C-alpha cells in the first residue's frame, strides 16, 4: 500500500513538473525506490529483535532529522505566471486558491486550519511557503471538483503557477514517504518474528 502511495505521489508531482525538471524528479524517485527495496530486503533477513530495535532507533533519528528539515524548508513563490498569453499576479492566483479551498465543506474542528491557510495566501507579504502549507494547499485542491470552463481555466492557471515549486516539492515528498516505507518494513518484520519468538519461549 505504501509503495503505491510513493509511486502515485511521485507520478503526480512529476507529471505536473516542467519537462526540464521531469528527468531529475523521476531519477530521484527511481533511486529512492531502489534504495527502499534494498532496505526492505535487508530488514526481511533479520531475525533478532535487538537488531530491529537498533534499526528502528536509527530510522527514528532519520525521521526526526527530516521532519526538522521539512519544518524549516521554504519554497519561493513566483511573483506571477502566464497562461494562454495572459499574465496573472501572485495575488490573482491566491484569490483562485482561496476560492477553491472555500468551497470545501468541513466539520468545525478543521475550519481553523482552512481559515489560517486562506489568510496566509491572502497576505500581501506572503512571498514564500513552507512545506506544511504547500502540502495542505495541494491536498485540499486535490479534493476539489471543478465545474465549468471558468473553474477549469482557473485551476489550470493555479497549476501553471505552482510548476516552479513542483520539482523540489516532489523530492521532499518522495524522501518523506521513503523514510516511512523503511520504518514500515521494520514494523512488519517485528510482527513476523514476535509470534515465532513467543512460541519458542513457551
Each predicted region: which residue ranges?
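Positively charged, low-complexity terminal tracts
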Residues: 2-202
Amino acid at each position: 500500500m505504501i509503495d503505491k502511495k510513493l509511486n502515485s505521489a511521485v507520478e503526480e508531482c512529476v507529471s505536473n513538473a516542467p519537462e526540464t525538471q521531469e528527468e531529475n524528479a523521476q531519477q530521484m524517485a527511481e533511486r529512492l525506490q531502489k534504495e527502499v527495496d534494498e532496505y526492505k530486503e535487508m530488514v526481511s533477513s533479520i531475525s533478532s529483535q535487538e537488531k530491529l530495535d537498533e534499526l528502528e532507533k536509527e530510522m527514528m533519528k532519520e525521521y526526526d532529522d527530516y521532519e526538522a528539515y521539512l519544518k524549516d524548508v521554504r519554497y519561493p513563490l513566483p511573483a506571477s505566471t502566464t497562461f494562454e498569453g495572459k499574465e496573472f499576479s501572485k495575488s490573482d492566483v491566491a484569490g483562485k486558491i482561496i476560492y477553491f479551498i472555500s468551497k470545501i465543506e468541513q466539520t468545525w474542528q478543521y475550519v481553523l486550519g482552512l481559515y489560517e491557510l486562506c489568510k496566509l495566501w491572502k497576505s500581501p507579504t506572503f512571498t514564500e511557503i513552507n512545506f506544511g502549507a504547500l502540502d495542505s494547499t495541494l491536498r485540499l485542491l486535490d479534493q476539489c471538483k471543478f465545474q465549468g470552463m471558468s473553474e477549469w481555466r482557473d485551476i489550470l492557471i493555479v497549476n501553471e503557477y505552482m510548476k516552479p515549486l513542483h520539482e523540489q516539492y516532489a523530492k521532499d515528498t518522495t524522501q518523506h514517504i521513503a523514510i516511512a516505507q523503511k520504518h514500515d518494513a521494520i514494523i512488519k518484520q517485528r510482527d513476523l518474528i514476535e509470534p515465532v519468538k513467543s512460541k519458542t519461549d513457551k
